[in-house]
Amino acid sequence: ITCCTRGTCAQHC
C-alpha cells in the first residue's frame, strides 16, 4: 500500500 502519498499516513512514512 502506498499510503505515503496520501494524507495523514504520509506523516509516519
Curated annotation (Swiss-Prot):
Q: Which domain of life, per UniProt?
A: Eukaryota
Location in the cell reads:
Secreted
Spell out the protein name for this chain: Alpha-conotoxin-like Br1.4
Family the entry assigns: Belongs to the conotoxin A superfamily.
Task: Specify the species.
Answer: Conus brunneus
Keywords in alphabetical order, please. Answer: Acetylcholine receptor inhibiting toxin, Disulfide bond, Ion channel impairing toxin, Neurotoxin, Postsynaptic neurotoxin, Secreted, Toxin
Q: Which cysteines share a disulfide bond?
A: C3-C9, C4-C13
User: Would the keyword Disulfide bond be found if you checked this record's keyword annotation?
Assistant: yes
Coarse class of the primary localization is secreted
- Drop me one GO molecular function for this one: toxin activity
Record comment regarding domains: The cysteine framework is I (CC-C-C). Alpha4/3 pattern.
Q: In which tissues is it expressed?
A: Expressed by the venom duct.
Q: What is the lineage of its organism?
A: Eukaryota, Metazoa, Spiralia, Lophotrochozoa, Mollusca
Q: Which residues form a coiled coil?
A: none
Among the entry's GO cellular component annotations, what is one? Answer: host cell postsynaptic membrane
The role this protein plays is: Alpha-conotoxins act on postsynaptic membranes, they bind to the nicotinic acetylcholine receptors (nAChR) and thus inhibit them.
